[in-house]
From Swiss-Prot:
Naturally occurring in which organism (per UniProt): Methanocaldococcus jannaschii (strain ATCC 43067 / DSM 2661 / JAL-1 / JCM 10045 / NBRC 100440)
Transmembrane segments: none
Annotated InterPro entries: Ni-dep_hyd_lsu, Ni-dep_hyd_lsu_Ni_BS, NiFe-Hase_large, NiFe/NiFeSe_hydrogenase_LSU
Pfam families assigned to the protein according to its UniProt record, in alphabetical order: NiFeSe_Hases
NCBIfam families reported for this sequence: VhuA
Binding site for Ni(2+): C61, C64
Enzyme Commission number(s) from the entry: 1.12.99.-
Coiled coil start-end: none
Domain of life: Archaea
Protein's UniProt keywords contain Transmembrane helix: no
Protein name from the UniProt record: F420-non-reducing hydrogenase vhu subunit A
């Protein structure tokens, strides 16, 4: 028996490696995906005043920092029984949408596109964003513009483009001025067009690689996502499980997550393996993120994105189970995010100064959930009577996907090593 070790994994938001164990015939026998960095944020926040935590947890991820900021402050609001004003909720949602635009553009164009635009057999020295700029400069310019637009939204609403600070218990610390709104709104229509161009691009690229898409990393799993009245939603928090055959849907609220999600400790990893409790481990492992979201929802929230979702399911089937279809799904979500940004920017509430409710620290337990760029993100805090965090649990989006990524790598390895 031998081993193939891939370390480090490149173009990854974090640190990891893959170990493929081969049998006596040189065929894959076992695959393990190792997340090699100990993070420890669940312990970092214990003993801290809860109002400090939304400024600490964005450091979990330099790309998804806004999602952590908002899941955190939503958890504190829930723990203290706070109902925030509607304009504050819309501001938070706009901030979150800005992060989705930035991250989805970065994820596809900077991390995934080099393999598709330049081809998987291209020299690794040029198979990167610089190579994309050289081969497809117009595509690269649109990608950069989308990222810039998303970051401008986060900066205007969140106070900073990286690690925003304006989400506070009870609402928002900063209103959006009319001038800031108008500055963002003038670019909204163009960004929708750029996002649509992204979907058309991935459809063209998929045609070249459809054999690989439909044979590598194809696995049947459960799916978990966020919906609001059955519609795809980035921010509001009804969670929905979908069965592998697409026939069973189970919905639950954030505060019920421990009744539905278990975490299995594996000895070779710094992350636990989440699973659907009703089914058990490992049969109940599930996927989150764009592919899962398009499967889980009944329809998209915005019209253009819904047209693209219907087309997506015609191509890949329902539920779509191809791991390489994540890129297509992500670009459909990018269209929805740009459409949603325009809707929120045109809402009169978005420049309201009614953005803060009074709060009093107290003992409580609260759960905050958002759909982060990589999938469902859960923050759960318990506070004492002084508002100090005494216990914290976080299930980060990528953590949900680790066991199913492992399964997908194993399936792909078996196909490649035939």
């Amino acid at each position: 028996m031998g081993k193939i070790v891939i370390e480090p994994l490149s173009r990854l938001e974090g640190h990891g490696k893959v170990t493929i164990t081969l049998d006596e015939n040189g065929k894959p026998k076992d695959v393990k995906l190792h997340i090699t960095a100990l993070r420890g944020f669940e312990q970092f926040v214990v003993g801290r005043p809860a109002e400090e935590v939304p400024r600490i947890v964005p450091r979990i991820c330099g790309i998804c920092q806004t999602a952590h900021h908002l899941a955190s402050v939503k958890a504190i609001d829930a723990a203290w029984g706070v109902e925030i004003p509607e304009p504050a909720k819309k501001l938070r949602e706009l901030m979150h949408i800005g992060n989705m635009i930035h991250s989805h553009a970065l994820h596809f164009y900077f991390l995934a596109a080099p393999d598709f635009v330049l081809g998987p057999d291209a020299d690794p020295a040029i198979r990167n964003i610089v190579g994309v700029i050289d081969k497809a400069p117009d595509v690269a310019k649109q990608a950069i513009a989308l990222r810039k637009f998303g970051q401008k939204i986060v900066e205007a609403v969140g106070g900073k483009a990286i690690h925003p600070v304006t989400g506070i218990p009870g609402g928002q610390a900063k209103r959006l001025t009319e001038e800031e709104r108008d500055e963002l709104l003038k670019d909204a229509d163009q960004m929708i067009e750029y996002a649509k161009n992204g979907v058309e691009l991935i459809k063209q690229l998929n045609e070249q690689y459809m054999e690989q898409i439909k044979t590598l990393g194809v696995i049947d799993t459960y799916y978990l996502g966020l919906v609001k009245d059955g519609k795809h939603n980035f921010y509001d928090d009804t969670l929905r499980f979908l069965s592998p055959d697409g026939k069973e849907k189970v919905e639950f609220k954030p505060e019920e997550y421990l009744n539905y999600i278990g975490e299995y400790v594996v000895p070779y990893n710094y992350v636990k393996h989440p699973y659907y409790k009703k089914v058990g481990y490992p049969e109940g492992v599930y996927r989150v993120g764009p592919l899962a979201m398009l499967n889980v929802c009944d329809e998209m929230e915005t019209p253009l994105a819904e047209e693209y979702r219907k087309e997506f399911l015609e191509i890949f089937g329902f539920p779509a189970n191809q791991s390489l279809a994540y890129n297509h799904a992500r670009l459909i979500e990018l269209v929805e995010a740009c459409e949603k940004a325009k809707i929120l920017l045109e809402d009169n509430d978005i420049t309201s100064d009614d953005i803060k409710a009074d709060v009093e620290p107290k003992a409580g337990n609260g759960v905050g959930v958002v759909y982060a760029p990589r999938g469902v993100l859960i923050h759960n805090y318990e506070t004492d009577e002084n508002g100090i965090v005494v216990k914290a649990n976080m299930i980060v989006a990528t953590t949900h996907n680790v066991p199913t990524m492992e399964k997908a790598i194993q399936q792909a390895a078996q196909v490649i090593f035939k």
